[in-house]
Amino acid sequence: MEKVLILGLGNNNGGKSSLLYFASKPDKYIVRVSDIAPKSNFKFIDEFKDMNVEFFFSDQDPKENIKWADVVIKNPAIPSKLPQLSLAHHISNDIAYLTTSEYVKNTHIITVTGTKGKSSTASAITHALKHLNKDVIICGNIGISAFTVLTELENRARQGIPMPDYIVIEMSSWQINDTYIALNAKMPKIKLAIFTSIYSDHLNSYKSKEEYLLDKVKLFNTNCELILIEKKIKKYFAQHRPQLVKRTTTFPKDSNPYISNKIELQCAYRALKLLKFKDSDIHNALFTYKGIPHRCEQVDVIDDIMFINDSAATIPEAASYSCKNISPLSYHIIMGGSDKKLTTLGIRFAARKASTITLLDGNYTQNKLIPYLEKHNYNYTGPFRSMQEAFDSAYTLAKEVKANTNKMQVVILSPGATSFELFTNEFDRGDKFKACVHNINNEANQ
């Protein structure tokens, strides 16, 4: 039997899905779990008490467990340069297992990466393909493990159910690099590979923007039948992948009917055109797309104040991009948080055009954002240590401006920073914002 080590359970159920996949096959795998965090961090562990799994929590040095394993399933958040990983016999991940499975040999794989817009683009394409009567499954960085999809495909095979027409995989730079390592410096066969945008990100994990982007471009090689990239990336892409220029298309083109819309609609339209769908069918499919949680998600409108949850805006440029989409409405932004070693350059539009600014606390807020705001004489309230305090401040300010202008106001959570000092992750941050909105609505209806 193969000895499998799940290295890192993570915050978004990826590790749980990996554990479930291997632990449910006791005739094939012997399973261990190693995580630096204590057991109390993982509420779901009791679900595995009747399975033959060894857990090593608060495991500060996983060296012996790594040496024990035939294969290490590495959580993407664990650095690939972790010294102990040099002792591994083989390192893999969920995407490598899925894309090399016999069950996907007749399924078209679509991959989506990019600093900004990858989740919403993957979601829009998946939505459209379903509307076009295609059997499609989405997974990856969007919060659905490829092991969950692989389990479904195995169940389909047992029941004689056809495999999906398409699998859409959203891939972070870490997932791309992990898959590249798992497949021995290769990538799986891809029908359409998409690169949505380039900005600095994860500089708390990468030495430079260039190192970060080099992981991104590992996704693109002769394994890709079709390639779609944002036109701003064209020069960079040609420098790093000159052999792929002939199979590469850019978006948006001047003829793109979604050129004035959000990036996901621009990209999804061009992607579906490359996949040979008709214009009228594409328009009908995208017309019904309503977006995904935490990404410019309209939560509610109460007394002419709109509430938007954009918690997934974890870099400054993403916050400014979202604010451009709601301007010229008067908006009251909740921003700030933890530092990914990014500059404040990208936050300029969001801060300059905001009617009011409310700050969430964090080392990015304290060390970079507040000095930037004060340098440019932008007023702000906070920083606050809880979402409720920040929300109450922004909401009060929005009501005051509305009373004076009698115009619709927008309260938007678009932090432009990560969340880990005050929240579990960006989804927890967004959920707490939505809970604040729902509390107002409940009070109004009493």
Provide a role label for each language-model segment:
Residues 159-255, 421-426:
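Flexible active-site lid/hinge loop adjacent to a nucleotide/diphosphate
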Residues 415-446:
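Glycine/aspartate-rich loop-and-adjacent alpha/beta segment that forms the canonical ThDP
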Residues 22, 72, 112, 141, ...:
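Residue-level signal for inorganic ion chemistry
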Residues 3, 21, 257-354:
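Nucleotide phosphate-binding/pyrophosphate-handling subdomain across enzymes
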Residues 32, 36-39, 45-47, 345-409:
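C-terminal helical cap/extension that packs against the catalytic core
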Residues 1-25, 29-111, 287, 295-297, ...:
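Short, basic phosphate-binding NTP loop
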Residues 10, 37-39, 142, 232-233, ...:
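Residues in the short beta-alpha loop(s) of Rossmann-like NAD(P)-binding domains
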Residues 98-142:
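Walker A (P-loop) phosphate-binding motif
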